[in-house]
């Protein structure tokens, strides 16, 4: 079985990488006045500029050839058609069906997926309108004021990120709170600020057995019953997103108040489903629907745009180029928009849980680096935290810079100041500052030659740091949908090019299984499993000191 590194296009790129490592972005721009127009493209609502990446025309041609040699178009068709491309779990991958605004029928395993999705969306809409209008009443006859979403991972990060993105645009109909951590501090801090009579809990767990989620759900219901006193009241204050009707019924949730999901939707791709219920409750169903519409627009672009202008594919190819060929093992996500402050954490899960694997489709260890470490924060805060390392560190970190043209809230000159930093940082990372420029600057400031000699080496910025810039028209619901879908399809393309199964997460399952065993040991001295000396020592220390 051959792996990707044996492809002709891969080997051509290896040679080009050796050559490109000797080139400087400053020189590439100087040689080509049309570089921006050649290496940028647009879709409605978004400009995508990758001209500050370390590529040239030859490299770009070779990257497109790699995509073709990996049959990216055929794999894309398989995904949209519902073929079971999640090969380790024998499942379709159909988060795109959740936002199929054309409502075209799609049959998978004898069921019309489109009809299932449309029915569930209608149920969500009805429920959301009932709660937001005040017609849904709690056990004491009062309407809902607060929503507490309890989930973890994909059941939490996506909805919370989208909610934060729309906070400045939403009304005050409902407050929403998110609980994901098994650390009791988080749920306790939420419960002390809400009223049991006016709170709705959304428990999101496909199996309704996820340890962290059910631990928090039990704490929530115990707290609720201290006030409500009657188990029958649970049905008016708890709803679920799950497929396990037996477990939800045991919990006290009416079947009518259980929203479903399907095994062809992975958690980290699920905010388009009923997992996004908290988004709709907070921002309104119309906003939730606009998120779906924005994502659908990108789905259509991804399906139909030529490979050379296909933004998700280009994003994936650049990531593979930077990671597997140029050797950059980290990537920063830097939104210059406070509304997108949770995007780095969301994409960290999306990319690293999807493509953080070391074997190919055939189970063979791959000889190249796969996914980079994804991290970041809002741009201005990052400038005063870690940009020093981006500019002068000896580890090069490619970065995605994201900003909006129109702010959600326009305050005096704030946005111009923000965007001036956005533009300046990518230019500085690309150009750097050389000895001649520094010497001229210090001389103009009246520094002596001795002072210049002392400072010179410390002030050199090599530049040549690759970045991509995305300019959004604005950050609204449709934009949020577009942006997330772009990265989702990037993840898919990256997985195909690297020959990685992007839709399982066996590393997550391993940790969950071990934690379950150790939990049993911590609560019952009679239970013993074999561990290494470090784990035994840590557990013994914990048990010795937890009651002191």
Curated annotation (Swiss-Prot):
What PROSITE patterns is this protein classified in? P_GLUCOSE_ISOMERASE_1, P_GLUCOSE_ISOMERASE_2, P_GLUCOSE_ISOMERASE_3
According to its UniProt record, where is this protein located?
Cytoplasm
Catalysed reaction equations from the record: alpha-D-glucose 6-phosphate = beta-D-fructose 6-phosphate
Quote the cellular component terms of the Gene Ontology held in the record. Answer: cytosol
GO biological-process terms attached to the record = gluconeogenesis; glucose 6-phosphate metabolic process; glycolytic process
Key words of the record: Cytoplasm, Gluconeogenesis, Glycolysis, Isomerase
Q: Which domain of life is it from?
A: Bacteria
Spell out the Pfam families in the cross-references.
Answer: PGI
Tell me which residues this entry annotates as catalytic: 353 (proton donor), 384, 512
The record's InterPro entries line, in alphabetical order, gives:
G6P_Isomerase, G6P_Isomerase_C, Phosphoglucose_isomerase_CS, SIS_dom_sf, SIS_PGI_1, SIS_PGI_2
Cystine residue pairs: none
Identify the EC number(s).
5.3.1.9
Quote the Gene3D superfamilies the UniProt record gives: 1.10.1390.10, Glucose-6-phosphate isomerase like protein, domain 1
Q: In which pathway does it act?
A: Carbohydrate biosynthesis; gluconeogenesis; Carbohydrate degradation; glycolysis; D-glyceraldehyde 3-phosphate and glycerone phosphate from D-glucose: step 2/4
Q: A single GO molecular function, which one?
A: glucose-6-phosphate isomerase activity
**Family stated for the protein in its record:** Belongs to the GPI family.
| Job of this protein | Catalyzes the reversible isomerization of glucose-6-phosphate to fructose-6-phosphate.
NCBIfam families assigned: PRK00179.1 (NF001211)
Protein name in UniProt: Glucose-6-phosphate isomerase
| Gene this chain is encoded by | pgi
């Amino acid at each position: 079985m051959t792996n990707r590194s044996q492809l002709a296009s891969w080997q051509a790129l290896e040679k080009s990488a050796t050559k490109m490592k000797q080139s400087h972005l400053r020189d590439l721009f100087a040689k080509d006045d049309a570089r921006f127009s050649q290496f940028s493209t647009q879709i409605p609502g978004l400009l995508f500029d990758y001209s500050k990446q370390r590529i040239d025309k030859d490299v770009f041609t070779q990257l497109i050839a790699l995509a073709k040699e990996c049959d990216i178009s055929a794999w894309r068709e398989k995904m949209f058609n519902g073929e079971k491309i999640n090969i380790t779990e024998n499942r379709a991958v159909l988060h795109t069906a959740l936002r199929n605004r054309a409502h075209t029928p799609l049959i998978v395993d004898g069921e019309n997926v489109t009809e299932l999705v449309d029915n569930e969306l209608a149920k969500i809409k009805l429920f959301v309108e009932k709660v937001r209008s005040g017609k849904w009443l709690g056990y004491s006859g009062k309407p809902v004021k607060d929503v507490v979403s309890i989930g973890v991972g994909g059941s939490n990060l996506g909805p919370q990120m989208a909610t934060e993105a729309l906070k400045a645009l939403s009304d005050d109909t409902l407050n929403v709170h998110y609980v994901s951590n098994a650390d009791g501090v988080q749920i306790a801090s939420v419960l002390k600020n809400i009223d049991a009579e006016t709170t709705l809990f959304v428990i999101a767990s496909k199996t309704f057995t996820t340890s962290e989620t059910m631990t928090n759900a039990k704490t929530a219901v115990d707290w609720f019953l201290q006030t409500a006193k009657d188990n029958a009241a649970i049905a008016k204050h708890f709803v679920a997103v799950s497929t396990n009707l037996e477990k939800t019924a045991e919990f006290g949730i009416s079947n009518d108040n259980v929203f479903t999901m399907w095994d062809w939707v992975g958690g980290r791709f699920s905010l388009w489903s009923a997992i996004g219920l908290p988004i709709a409750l907070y921002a309104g169903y119309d906003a939730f629907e606009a998120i779906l519409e924005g994502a659908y627009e990108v789905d259509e672009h991804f399906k139909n745009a030529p490979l050379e202008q296909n933004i998700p594919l280009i994003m994936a190819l650049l990531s593979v180029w930077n990671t597997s060929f140029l050797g950059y093992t980290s990537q920063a996500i830097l939104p210059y928009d406070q509304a997108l402050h949770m995007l780095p954490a969301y994409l960290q899960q999306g990319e690293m849980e999807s493509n953080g694997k070391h074997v190919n489709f055939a189970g063979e260890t791959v000889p190249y680096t796969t996914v980079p470490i994804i991290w970041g924060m809002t741009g201005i805060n990052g400038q005063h935290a870690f940009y020093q390392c981006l500019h002068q560190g000896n580890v090069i970190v490619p970065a995605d810079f994201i900003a909006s043209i129109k702010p959600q809230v326009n305050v005096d000159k704030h946005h111009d100041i923000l965007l001036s930093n956005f533009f300046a940082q990518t230019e500085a990372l690309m150009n750097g500052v050389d000895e001649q420029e520094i010497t001229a600057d210090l001389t103009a400031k009246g520094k002596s030659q001795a002072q210049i000699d002392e400072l010179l080496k410390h002030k050199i910025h090599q530049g040549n740091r690759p970045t991509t810039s995305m300019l959004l028209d604005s950050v609204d619901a449709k934009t949020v949908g577009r942006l997330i879908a772009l990265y989702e399809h990037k993840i898919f393309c990256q997985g195909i090019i690297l020959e990685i199964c992007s839709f399982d997460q066996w590393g997550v399952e391993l940790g969950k299984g071990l934690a379950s065993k150790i939990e049993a040991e911590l609560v019952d001295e009679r239970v013993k499993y074999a561990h290494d000396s470090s784990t035994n020592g840590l557990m013994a220390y914990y048990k010795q000191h937890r009651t002191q």
